[in-house]
Amino acid sequence: MIELRNLSQRFPGPGGWVEALRNINLTIPQGEVFGIIGRSGAGKSTLVRTINLLTRPTEGNVVVGGRDLTMLPAGALREARREIGMIFQHFNLLSSRTVFDNVALPLELAGASRAEIDAAVLPLLDLVGLSAQKDRYPSQISGGQKQRVGIARALASQPKVLLSDEATSALDPETTRSILDLLKRINRELGLTIVLITHQMEVIKQVCDRVAVLDAGRVVEEGRVIDVFLQPHHEVTRALIGDVIAQELPPALKARVAERLKTGRGHLLRLAFTGSGVDQPILSETIRRYELDFNILHGQIDEIQGQAFGSLAVLAGGEPGKVGQALAFLREQGVVVEELSYVE
């Protein structure tokens, strides 16, 4: 549905050219919720704005629905953009227009009749849960409701793609969850492709199918959300995941473990379980089979897209040969094993 091919974006800056995007290649299938995450300044907003050519790339191609937007003349590009809705961190509602009239605005600009507007807007207000607020003004509704108006307005032209640029970053956690639930419902019921920009891994965890991690204008990691959580490879990804699931021991515990490792022998491991592995007695079976001592230092169980996910930090002790066999056994059971340190 969406293909970004060798995409680069440069801007002139005070000290020379700024490389905002560097050779981005992404493919987003139709109907997927795709997350793009990174710290501030990573190039996320620049990237999402190239998808509808609000920002035209310096190099590369943007293909949406089989059409290369970078090659379209102005009139055809305007037509293609009607199939791409967009919501922002700031709601950009017109204070002098009611909720209904804000949602109706794109249709009015497209020359739709009043009957066509009514037929389109009323179901959208029902979809986003604002039927009872249709005659209110932006000053009379909450921040979460304003974002729902923004979503309904973005859907008014019946787009096939919805771009979300930090749409929940100004909202409280409870409202954020409700907006993300709404986006999942829209994706499910309308078959809409959603590209979601955020700096919060919690948002990615809750709603996205796949994710790309952006750093300094480059995609440094990409994959299914569950896989990226299980085995993050890049240090930026590890830091972002650490905001949601602890990747390291708390400092005080880490210091105590370091002291213990100095006086003996042991393996400090991080074990990650997913799916049915979370519910199985894999660890106790490993202990019995290989006569090991496992000291659980730190643990967490969470859920990613309805799939259970567990992470444990353990200190393993036993005969070196049996420890190696145990780690191989754990991997055979689908456990992701990461050796954090080994002290003889």
From Swiss-Prot:
PROSITE patterns: ABC_TRANSPORTER_1, ABC_TRANSPORTER_2, METN
Keywords: Amino-acid transport, ATP-binding, Cell inner membrane, Cell membrane, Membrane, Nucleotide-binding, Translocase, Transport
Keyword field contains ATP-binding: yes
Documented EC number(s): 7.4.2.11
Cellular component terms per the entry's GO annotation: plasma membrane
One annotated GO molecular function: ATP hydrolysis activity
Membrane topology: Peripheral membrane protein
Binding-site list for ATP: 38-45
The keyword Metal-binding appears for this protein: no
Localization per record: Cell inner membrane
SUPFAM superfamilies: ACT-like, P-loop containing nucleoside triphosphate hydrolases
Stretches assigned to the ABC transporter domain: 2-241
Domain of life: Bacteria
InterPro entries hit by this protein: AAA+_ATPase (IPR003593), ABC_transporter-like_ATP-bd (IPR003439), ABC_transporter-like_CS (IPR017871), ACT-like_dom_sf (IPR045865), MetN_ABC (IPR041701), MetN_ABC_transporter-like (IPR050086), NIL_domain (IPR018449), P-loop_NTPase (IPR027417)
Catalyzed reactions per annotation: L-methionine(out) + ATP + H2O = L-methionine(in) + ADP + phosphate + H(+); D-methionine(out) + ATP + H2O = D-methionine(in) + ADP + phosphate + H(+)
Free-text function comment from the UniProt entry: Part of the ABC transporter complex MetNIQ involved in methionine import. Responsible for energy coupling to the transport system.
Quaternary organization: The complex is composed of two ATP-binding proteins (MetN), two transmembrane proteins (MetI) and a solute-binding protein (MetQ).
PANTHER family: AMINO ACID IMPORT ATP-BINDING PROTEIN (PTHR43166), METHIONINE IMPORT ATP-BINDING PROTEIN METN (PTHR43166:SF30)
Family affiliation: Belongs to the ABC transporter superfamily. Methionine importer (TC 3.A.1.24) family.
The name this protein goes by in its record: Methionine import ATP-binding protein MetN 1
Species this protein is from: Burkholderia lata (strain ATCC 17760 / DSM 23089 / LMG 22485 / NCIMB 9086 / R18194 / 383)
Lineage: Bacteria, Pseudomonadati, Pseudomonadota, Betaproteobacteria, Burkholderiales
Gene name linked to the record: metN1
